[in-house]
Amino acid sequence: MRLLAPALKAVADRRVVLLTPPHAPQILALTALGIPPAAAVWLRADRTADALWAAEQVLRSGSCGALLFWPGQTSKSSARQQPVRADSLRRLHLAAQQGETLFFLFRPLATEIDASPAPLRLSVRPAPGGIDIGFVKRQGPQREEPLFLPMSISTTRARPQRQPLPEEQMPVPAIASDAQKALIKA
């Protein structure tokens, strides 16, 4: 989500729709991304067909700044995402072209081999110290190597860090002198 922060901030004066996200949206996290709580709209659907219909309506209306859609994550679906048919993807792509709405579709990595009408398709994978962004499909020349994006300090600081103890000997507390022992006994 942090990758989308600049784009979402640019449209934060309009509604930002989160359609069937895998987890309940966290207001503080959305605020950190630049989305005011009043601009966030969380939509859930019981069936994938209902979610696809809602996505198409949001895109065609042009009334929202952005649509973030996780297809197959309906309230009655299993833990595994259901695939979206190619004709449904084509309809969403056409609706996105007609409207003035940013459209982000989040799908599992297993679907990166499937065809899609989207002009830009990215794969995001964790990497030590950041993330690797793969270019599945883009306009222009093919890029084989993923783009490494380091994580900012603020996100790594939030996680507990394990650090080894220094190898030098720690000072041992001094033993109380006889005079101090006498004072303690008195």
Where on the chain are the PLM-derived regions?
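N-terminal regions of ATP-driven nucleic-acid and macromolecular assemblies
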Residues: 1-186
